[in-house]
Swiss-Prot record:
The keyword Cytoplasm does not apply. It is found in: Secreted. GO terms for cellular component: extracellular region. Its EC number is 3.4.21.-. The lineage of its organism: Bacteria, Bacillati, Bacillota, Bacilli, Bacillales. This is Thermostable alkaline protease. The active site is at D124, H154, S307. Pfam families: Inhibitor_I9, Peptidase_S8. Binds 2 calcium ions per subunit. Its main location: secreted. Ca(2+) 1 binds at Q94, D132, L165, N167, I169, V171. Shows keratinolytic activity. GO terms for molecular function: metal ion binding; serine-type endopeptidase activity. One of its GO terms (biological process) is proteolysis.
Length: 361
């Protein structure tokens, strides 16, 4: 219920993305309207304020709509509107990806644990068809790109780290037997919005995903996004997110939320990557430098970034879910944290380097 489609009431975020207006006074921008549950519906908002509703969330009390400055001003005065925020841009956490053996994945594989039965939603630029990947399904929340096919490469790269097939070609993913779902929330340029990400989370909830990988981020917080994250957590989904690539303190959203495992990146020596954002929200670390994985055009490329570290953790989460099917999202999270290898300062490395072998014992 956070961003775009179906929800109820008013509140949250302003558009972030484009908007070529006609008359300045009539220019419309996208906002996320957070409302009082049961008090306001998209229909009542349309009728009372004559606004263009794009989406009403089902799981959270948020309406995604286009508003003029005059409409925005009126809505802010509505006592049933808790917040209104711009539908801010969300971008890829990437620089320019090795780490399967580094996190001791082979120990899990040697025990016959490959991720069978775990469902992982990759919220990204989509996933391209590739001989080293098996896509179980998906959806697109980019209006100009109705297919979940990846036209960028980032999502395909992330997907390969999670679950590239054990088929003797290309690369091997952390959980090669996990079910991958391509949820496109970023366009061909690697840009999306708070609304598209919230819709992707909502899709994951409605389609019973176990794990959500979010190798993306925004520097600004969002009531809508936080609502969606909390709803997914309550639905039993483990969310994993990229900390960011600024090299400075200040973890990106949604990774900064307590409902998301914030992932930092380390190099081949187990040292924090120079670009890896740090702060008290960091929960776990994983390989994120020169990571080789699947890419568009049936290719393989090496990329670096916390975007590349995050799917290592999502993959280990899939292995744990496969090893312990009855585990809740919180139990999986606790297992990963308790079995990590200590690396140093928690603000840099969190609980340490994720360890697939110990996590699946």
């Amino acid at each position: 219920m956070r961003q775009s489609l179906k929800v109820m009431v008013l509140s949250t975020v302003a558009l972030l993305f484009m908007a070529n207006p006609a008359a300045a006074s009539e220019e419309k921008k996208e906002y996320l309207i957070v409302v009082e549950p049961e008090e306001v519906s998209a229909q009542s908002v349309e009728e009372s304020y004559d606004v263009d509703v794009i989406h009403e969330f089902e799981e959270i009390p948020v309406i995604h709509a286009e508003l003029t400055k005059k409409e925005l001003k009126k809505l802010k005065k509505d006592p049933n509107v808790k917040a209104i925020e711009k539908n801010a841009e969300v971008t890829i956490s990437q620089t320019v990806p090795w780490g399967i053996s580094f996190i001791n994945t082979q120990q899990a594989h040697n025990r016959g644990i490959f991720g069978n039965g775990a469902r992982v939603a990759v919220l990204d630029t989509g996933i391209a068809s590739h001989p080293d990947l098996r896509i179980a399904g998906g959806a697109s929340f980019i209006s100009s790109e109705p297919s979940y096919h990846d036209n960028n490469g980032h999502g395909t790269h992330v997907a390969g780290t999670i679950a590239a097939l054990n088929n003797s070609i290309g690369v091997l993913g952390v959980a090669p037997s996990a079910d991958l779902y391509a949820v496109k929330v970023l366009d061909r340029n690697g840009s999306g919005s708070l609304a598209s990400v919230a819709q992707g989370i909502e899709w994951a909830i409605n389609n019973n995903m176990h794990i959500i990988n979010m190798s993306l981020g925004s520097t600004s917080g969002s009531s809508t996004l936080e609502l969606a994250v909390n709803r997914a957590n309550n639905a039993g989904i483990l969310l994993v997110g990229a900390a960011g690539n600024t090299g400075r303190q200040g973890v990106n959203y949604p990774a900064r939320y307590s409902g998301v495992m914030a992932v930092a990146a380390v190099d081949q020596n187990g040292q924090r990557a120079s670009f890896s954002t740090y702060g008290p929200e960091i929960e776990i670390s994983a390989p994120g430098v020169n990571v080789n994985s699947t890419y568009t055009g049936n290719r393989y490329v090496s990329l670096s970034g916390t975007s590349m570290a995050t799917p290592h953790v999502a993959g280990v989460a899939a292995l744990v879910k496969s090893r312990y099917p009855s585990y809740t999202n919180n139990q999986i999270r606790q297992r990963i944290n308790q079995t990590a290898t200590y690396l140093g300062s928690p603000s840099l490395y969190g609980n340490g380097l994720v360890h697939a072998g110990r996590a699946t014992q």
